[in-house]
């Protein structure tokens, strides 16, 4: 989200990173709050997709995070009669998926006629929440490899020089030092904090071990019958909001009759598996409300895709 706050509380360059609350300790994620120019504040919430409780809603967790006193402070009036009243104004909203598994999860970055660079490939320094420099560097390395290929009269082949150059670059060294950061969180927030601190500040990223993931994120999900529903507070329309009003200010546009780009191979799976076993988690994990379970005329359920 993008907000405009009271100039008296604005500190250009101020950075806040948080971990833990409101999520459980076994759920990977965290939040950021950056003070930019013109009394603007950019804030966001990251939720790892390896969470176990299907009732969790990344969007609702973000809204709840803003109610923490240390965060709410920047949006409310803390003086006079109207003390505690929200005086800041929300200007924008957005959401995206982040490839944040680190260097150990990089895919094959080259294919005939093309290459993957930047955050889409996973070149993200997870511990520092930095990716722009990696996107620029990998773009440069891929461009140099493409230039050499064109100079040699080659076309539509595989740019093997690009991944080779990456492995010799300072970026590889930087990301390699960060390789265990996310994987430590499978042991919980406390152990992850201790071990990441040890690796990054004591060993300076020169650890002789590498943590490997043994199963994909979705495999950590538990059936709804084994989990407790999460009671999220209703939005107040001042500090916390619902999905519909948020999407409205996201500047997302499409043609009125544009065909949906999301399709189902088997329409029975969302109902017979996801709704029956996991309480319809897709109705919660999408921060734009794209997936919605509705009733048919015969009172049976179906997944409606609002795209």
Protein language model annotation of sequence segments:
Residues 1-12:
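Central beta-strand plus flanking loop segment that forms part of the substrate or channel wall
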Residues 45-46, 120-130, 267-270, 293, ...:
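Glycine- and acidic
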Residues 93-108:
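Acidic, polar low-complexity linker/tail segments
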Residues 122-128, 134, 140, 144-191, ...:
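Active-site-proximal substrate-binding core of FAD-dependent oxidoreductases
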Residues 169-304:
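Ferredoxin-type iron-sulfur electron-transfer modules and their immediate structural context
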């Amino acid at each position: 989200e993008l907000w405009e706050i009271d100039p008296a509380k604005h500190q250009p360059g101020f950075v806040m990173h948080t971990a833990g609350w409101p999520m459980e300790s076994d759920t990977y994620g965290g939040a950021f709050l950056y003070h930019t120019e013109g009394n603007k504040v950019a804030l966001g919430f990251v939720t790892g997709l390896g969470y176990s409780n299907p009732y969790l809603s990344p969007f609702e967790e973000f809204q709840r995070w803003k109610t923490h006193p240390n965060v709410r402070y920047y949006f409310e009036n803390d003086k006079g009669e109207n003390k505690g009243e929200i005086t800041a104004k929300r200007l924008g909203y957005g959401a995206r998926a982040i490839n944040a598994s680190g260097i150990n999860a990089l895919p094959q970055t080259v294919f005939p006629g093309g290459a993957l660079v930047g955050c889409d490939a996973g070149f993200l320094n997870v511990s520092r929440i930095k990716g722009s420099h990696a996107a620029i560097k990998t773009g440069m390395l891929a461009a140099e490899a493409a230039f050499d290929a064109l100079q040699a009269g080659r076309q539509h082949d595989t740019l093997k020089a690009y991944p080779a150059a990456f492995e010799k670059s300072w970026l590889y060294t930087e990301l390699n030092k960060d390789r265990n950061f996310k994987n430590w969180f499978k042991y919980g927030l406390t152990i992850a904090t201790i071990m990441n601190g040890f690796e990054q500040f004591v060993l300076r990223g020169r650890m002789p071990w590498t943590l490997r993931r043994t199963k994909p994120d979705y495999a950590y999900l538990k059936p709804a019958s084994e989990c407790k529903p999460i009671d999220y507070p209703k939005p107040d329309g001042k500090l916390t909001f619902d999905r519909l009003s948020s999407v409205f200010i996201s500047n997302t546009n499409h043609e009125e009759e544009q065909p949906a780009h999301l399709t189902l191979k088997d329409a029975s799976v969302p109902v017979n598996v996801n709704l029956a076993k996991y309480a319809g988690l897709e109705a919660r994990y999408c921060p734009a409300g794209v997936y919605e379970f509705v009733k048919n005329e015969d009172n049976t359920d179906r997944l409606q895709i609002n795209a």
